[in-house]
UniProtKB/Swiss-Prot annotation:
Residues 38-48, 65-77, 101-110 have a biased composition (Acidic residues). One of its GO terms (biological process) is cell differentiation. It holds the Pfam family MEA1. The keyword Phosphoprotein applies. Keywords: Developmental protein, Differentiation, Phosphoprotein, Spermatogenesis. This is Male-enhanced antigen 1. May play an important role in spermatogenesis and/or testis development. The modification Phosphoserine is found at residue 103. It comes from Sus scrofa (Pig).
Length: 174
């Protein structure tokens, strides 16, 4: 760890050592045979202020709102841009799969699947496994809100069914 020079004193990471030009008191003198107190190699002090490790330095950004405007290269046709991107992809050796063919049937299926979360296909055995697993789940008492303690399971199922029916009755907006 490098020593930092502050006001003529040299500070190390663990101790404060007096400068060699200062007079040492009788109890502070260096002892013969003491070597480097650290096993690390000494680091050179950074000569430039603000220079960090590996030579990086802080450079403030211009805060003036009147900056020079950067001129962007004119964009050509959409086809030219797409062709340029495809050329770059081929030059890099990348392959993108062809986009799927669009059809109205797929769009309707996707919208239906998004609006109806219960459309996950499960066989009866899987349904029973999910039911058994969920039956074993219990929330800690502080985790259950007061309104949930005041309503029975039958009442809650009725509320959920009404909410699902209302959701299915409203048209899906695209």
């Amino acid at each position: 760890m490098a020593a930092v020079v502050l006001g003529g004193d040299i500070m190390g990471p663990e101790r404060i050592f007096p400068n060699q030009t200062e007079e040492l008191g009788p109890h502070q003198g260096p002892t013969e045979g003491t070597g480097d107190w650290s096993s690390e190699e000494p680091e050179e002090e950074q000569e430039e202020t603000g220079t960090g490790p590996a030579g990086y330095s802080y450079q403030p950004l211009n805060q003036d709102p009147e900056q020079e405007e950067v001129e962007l290269a004119p964009v050509g046709d959409g086809e030219d841009v797409v062709a340029d991107i495809q050329d770059r992809i081929q030059a890099l050796g990348l392959h993108l799969p062809d986009p799927p063919l669009e059809s109205e049937d797929e769009d309707e299926e996707g919208a239906t699947a998004l609006s109806n979360h219960s459309s996950i296909p499960m066989d009866p055995e899987h349904v029973e496994l999910v039911k058994r697993t969920m039956a074993g789940v219990s929330l800690p008492a502080p985790g259950v809100p007061a309104w949930a303690r005041e309503i029975s399971d039958a009442q809650w199922e009725d509320v959920v069914q009404k909410a699902l029916q209302a959701r299915q009755a409203t048209p899906a907006w695209k």
